[in-house]
Amino acid sequence: MFPRYPRYLWRNTQPKINVIQTPPLRVLSDYQIKIIKDSWEILNKHPVESGQAIFYTFLKRYPEHKKRYPAFRNMTLEELKDTPQIRHHCSRIMEFFGAAIDSLGTEQQRDILVTALSDNADYHGKKGITKEHFIQMRNVMLEVISGACKLDDEEKKAWSDLMDIMYHITFNVLDALNK
């Protein structure tokens, strides 16, 4: 005879798993690459300030992530503005994206993107950064870039396709780390 369990245990008690799908690996057209590079020039005129706008918006929208940064976890968002730590971190973010964007349309594009994004995903994945965190950053980046550069729908699509490429590589590395 099977043991008797309370009725509430008969239901499937497994937690629902929210699986974030890996975006497709897209191919950017020459025109999309031009759109991305032209709008990046706008952001790159003031790279640290652009990086701060992205990172500050990210932390404002998702304050729980501030605890992941020991250098400024105990500061308020207002205290964070223009601190050397935040300026340094934001300049690194912009350098990372700048190198990726500079590689677009070159013969080295694939190698540069795969290497840089794999290293970045490996580093962040080992610190417990998940696909959900990357999606949150993606949404903030697209919003800030779109606003700063006044992108139309076609330009937003180009940036979204670039993010799909970047996150395709990133998510494959994160999946490998979690096996």
Segments predicted by a language model, with ranges:
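Globin-like tetrapyrrole-binding proteins
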Residues: 2-179
